[in-house]
Amino acid sequence: VTKTINRINKTLLTQSEFKDRFKLIVVNNGEAINHPSGNGIIVINNENLGGSGGFMRGLIEAGKINDVKHVIFMDDDGSCEIESICRTHAFLLMAKDKNTVVTGCMLFEDNPAIIHESGAIWHRDFLHYPDKHYLDAREIDSLDTFDNERKIGYGGWWFFAFNINAIEYYSFPFFVRGDDLLFGYMHKKHNIVTLNGVASWQMDFERKISVLNSYLNFRTVAVPALISKRKFAALLLSVFFVREVFLASFSCRYELARAMIMSYNDCLSGREFWEDNVDLLEIRK
């Protein structure tokens, strides 16, 4: 984290062209960061309420700063070129619609030419799938596919830029995975676009599969389904649940199946469960 702060400070915050236009807010959900605030850098130590709690705390703090018009959400475990930030800044300054949002393309850090997602598409109002998944950016034929714009349902928080006045709701400060999905679900008015040269490199999600992530991933799918007004959403959720449990069981990943069953039960436990387990401390043990 400190290296990222220093890089952005050196290449952006201290440059005469940008130093009065940008602030860097670092919300730390873990151990305290030994880095002073000042010179456009604001370090905030926060209770660990997951990515959602951290990003929402940063959004609240950004709203307290005079003249802040736009915010970029960026994960601490990802990397991007400073040029991506500059391009996004220039684009949003010219955007006439306050609901215009820029989402960065995500590529794999261990295979940097392969795209994981360039925005995501809603399916059945709560399921989703990544657009341009596994597209090879080196191939000439990929250029035509990449330039084919589709209606994007939400953008990941590895790089997500928006007008602060376009936010109607804060995300729930729950310890969740896929909090960017829930945020997008609550802001369907956003006009989400992608830009060439705006991207972030992240670890492949397949390498992050774990019992806890399986628990959290199912909650991410379940919440939109439970609040959806779409007919048969609850039935589709049940079908999805049964399929995922069977797939995990038949591949002998019984601990993942148990985690999903536990997540399903907790999601149906009512409002009290969510209020009493905001940080999921007992679950994470």
Write out the residue ranges for each language-model feature.
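Terminal low-complexity segments of carbohydrate-biosynthetic enzymes
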Residues: 219-285
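Active-site nucleotide-sugar/metal-binding loop of Leloir-type enzymes
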Residues: 56-70
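Short, acidic, metal-binding catalytic loop of nucleotide-sugar glycosyltransferases
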Residues: 4-21
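Conserved donor NDP-sugar-binding/catalytic core segment of glycosyltransferases
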Residues: 83-129
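Donor nucleotide-sugar recognition loop
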Residues: 153-159, 168-185, 190-198, 212
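A recurrent flexible, glycine/aromatic-enriched loop bordering the glycosyltransferase active site
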Residues: 133-159, 208
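Conserved donor nucleotide-binding strand/loop of the catalytic core
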Residues: 37-53, 61
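Short beta-strand-to-loop acidic/aromatic patch adjacent to the donor-nucleotide binding site
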Residues: 67-79
